[in-house]
Amino acid sequence: MARIAIIGLVGKSMFFDVPRFHVGGETITARGYYEEWGGKGFNQAVAAARQGAAVAFLGAVGAQDAKPVHGFCAKEGVCATLAAKRTQSACAAILTDDVGETRVTVCPGAALVPRDVDGFAGAIATADALVLNNEVPEAVNVAAVELAVKYEVKVLFNPAPARSMPKVIRDAVTVWTPNEFEESALGDVPGEVVTTLGAKGCRIRSTGEVIPASPAKAVDTTGAGDTFTAVLAVRLAEGESLRDACVAANEASSQSVSVKYVMPSLPTRA
């Protein structure tokens, strides 16, 4: 069984179904509303667990939300370490239009600090892969990659949202999983880059190969990128080649876009 350690944001995701997106100064009435726990790292943790991995997750929540988040993680088979903070949990508003495209606004809320990583060191040390993203403070990711380097753990990094990163992170990452916009911001990095291309699939930078996605009717693309990163991490941790892992990640992402919202869309491994 692959052992995956994931650090990320966890908070309340609020979904609004809209006929189209706003223009400046416009108010639109939503056709539906749904909420769930989410965040990039949180989504990736649940997705990896549903793929059969042993998942350890580190995140920060408002103290009032620690119990329900722990309960949800336990139900999904995710071993969660939650840093309870004296502030509100993070939240995100996700608008989805009639063709399944999304617009997302995030309020960070409760945030990890580097010392929170100290209590997660054992999970990193025993992991086959560490998965990180940019929804947590840079100093937290630095602390995590330093442990990964110390224990010789491969690092997958989903550089979203896009931002510049220090050399200590750039040098430690084994595989990056940006989308096309994030890839342009990432530039040249030592590790392998697998760029997600939406309905077109993904591209492996070192070979230039585009691996096509399976045909799918897009209902909601919100969780597709997190599904891709999680499945890629699990398959690489299991020893698959990068190309084979990309094929599996593409397939899982195609499944995810056909289901509304994130948690219901994260596929279970057959």
Predicted regions and their residues:
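Glycine-rich phosphate/adenosyl-contacting loop at the front of the ribokinase-like
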Residues: M1-L58, K67-P68, A218-V219
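Ribokinase/PfkB-type carbohydrate-kinase core domain
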Residues: M1-V10, H70-A84, I94-V210
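Conserved phosphate-binding/catalytic region of the ribokinase-like
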Residues: I4-A5, L186-A270
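Gly/Ala-rich phosphate-binding loop of Rossmann-like dinucleotide-binding domains
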Residues: A49-R50, V149, A237
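Short, basic and Ser/Thr-rich N-terminal targeting/leader segments
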Residues: Q51, E76, T87-A90
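Electropositive, gly/pro-rich neighborhoods at or near active sites that engage anionic ligands
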Residues: A60-V61, T87, P264-S265
